[in-house]
Amino acid sequence: AIAKLPMDEVSRMKRADEMGYNRDAYHGSTRDIREFNTVFGNREGHYGANHYFTNSVDDLGKNYAGEGPDLTQRITEKMERLGDEGIEPSRKAAKEALGIENKGVSYPVKLKLKNPVKTHGKDETFFDYQAKYDEDPSSDYYEEFLGEEGKFIDLIDDTKRVMRNWNVDDVDGVMAKLQDANMDMEGISASQFEDVMRNNIYDLYHPETGQMSSVGELIADVYKTMGYDGVEMGAYKAFGPQKRGGGRWGGEGYMTKGMEGLDQDTLHYIAFEPHQIRSKFAKFDPTKS
């Protein structure tokens, strides 16, 4: 007879850790989720139609467990689009189109992120760059340029390929902005890369579905192409209070309010594939990893 797996919490969490599901997180949804997919994913989300999680119960309660700011905006936009399509724009119709089935449920999960891009945090991913020269020992002035290497080169190559696949209007202009961001010739951070992309690409449509999409989904495609399996984001630095104004224009500027429910330790996780996500109450059967 096949021995049954012990189902006490200690045994399940031990198996979860051994299988790589070692990050505790929460997902807030107005859908009754049996398994994760992107059917009702928001292509205009910060990283497009991927899977979003937080490590903070406070963040979850304030922003994601019900009709928080993001979902309220999506409902309003959907109502406007229904009207454009000749359908009576009601909240009920918009909710049905968005797959909203309840008033908000919190899902505790275990995530398997082996190689996430880290952004807006203390140890964020850095795409390094090195220019290689062969110094002529007989000359104090002559150096032969041998080439370039580093993660920045991979980033540039993969970004160009993905942008062309997405039919971005000004690929060369965006590439020039990325090169400008590497002015010190040492490389750029993930947040610097994202700032350039988000500030210089507009009016995107998904190459497969034709749906309007966010620059974030293109960014996620770049990360996937480079071999990353998700994103770990310092949410407070990304979405907390931000300074506006001042700087070289003079004056003290001002601080925006930012999202509620965040603190310096709040992390947002974005998983690219459904198999990276398991309910905290799953069996964690090694034969079904």
Feature names for model-found ranges:
Residues 1-289:
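Active-site and NAD+-binding cores of ADP-ribose-processing enzymes
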